[in-house]
């Protein structure tokens, strides 16, 4: 985690990330039944391996108090087949439950989510500049796009839904030329699922993982080599591919936090 995120990750941070995984996995399994995210995503697999080692401590009992919550999610999710409706439910859960359950993380990292209208304006403005100045579009082959602070994936999902990427361009763009980074585990999970669900809704067919997303600190990832890649090899490999890519377009909204009066001022300076 120190390698993939940053050197300031503490033991408490690691414990909280495992707690996030324990709490959220049942939610995603309910919302995206049959979806292969939890078995295919490299970070989810790495977290699950750590929990498998800890199973002897009967960790399941720690989440039994949440059974009513999981049951309510199952009830709300039953019958929802529209990917956008599931997206809305996931983001609502994040805003009303997850962000409050892990308030220290959200306060520390200054998490802010951009209104969809602003996201759409930014995406279309970038496409116009590409056309006017470079004779290309966001769908053009060779135009690598990154959202370095993806949050729950709104910029990427709206890009896919924008109509600016032609149907014949979509598969190549999705598989090879769209990149996203996120440092908060919960948001990373939600972003990956949202992006994959939107792509599947557009293209249909079999499940296709979004291999362009990394659990990483964008500010730190260019400052050191992979030192412990054996622990999260697939995520580290994604980071290496991203660093080797010729990024042409950066879209997004950097996280910020105002008025912090704690040790977390160091986080402010990282974004500042």
Language-model features: where?
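SAM-dependent methyltransferase catalytic region
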Residues: 85, 97-270
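Non-catalytic, mostly N-terminal accessory regions of nucleic-acid modification and defense proteins
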Residues: 1-117, 199-212
């Amino acid at each position: 985690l120190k390698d993939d995120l940053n050197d300031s990750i503490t033991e408490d941070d690691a414990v909280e990330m495992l707690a996030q995984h324990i709490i959220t996995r049942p939610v995603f399994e309910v919302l995206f039944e049959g979806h292969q995210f939890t078995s295919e995503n490299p970070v989810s697999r790495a977290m699950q391996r750590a929990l498998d080692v800890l199973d002897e401590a009967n960790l399941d009992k720690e989440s039994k108090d949440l059974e009513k919550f999981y049951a309510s999610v199952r009830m709300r999710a039953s019958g929802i087949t529209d990917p956008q409706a599931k997206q809305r439910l996931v983001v609502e859960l994040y805003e009303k439950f997850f962000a409050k359950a892990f308030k220290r993380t959200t306060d520390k990292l200054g998490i802010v989510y951009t209104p969809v209208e602003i996201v759409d304006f930014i995406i279309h403005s970038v496409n116009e500049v590409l056309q006017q100045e470079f004779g290309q579009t966001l769908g053009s082959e060779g135009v690598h796009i990154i959202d370095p602070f993806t949050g729950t994936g709104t910029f990427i999902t709206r890009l896919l839904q924008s109509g600016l990427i032609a149907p014949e361009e979509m598969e190549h763009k999705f598989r090879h030329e769209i990149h996203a980074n996120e440092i908060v585990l919960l948001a990373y999970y939600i972003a990956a699922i949202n992006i994959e669900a939107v792509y599947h809704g557009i293209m249909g067919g079999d499940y296709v993982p979004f291999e362009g997303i990394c659990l990483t600190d964008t500010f730190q990832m260019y400052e050191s080599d992979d030192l412990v890649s054996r622990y999260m090899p697939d995520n580290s490999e994604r980071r290496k591919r991203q660093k080797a890519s010729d990024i042409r377009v950066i879209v997004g909204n950097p996280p910020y936090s105002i008025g912090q009066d704690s040790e977390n001022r160091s986080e402010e300076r990282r974004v500042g």
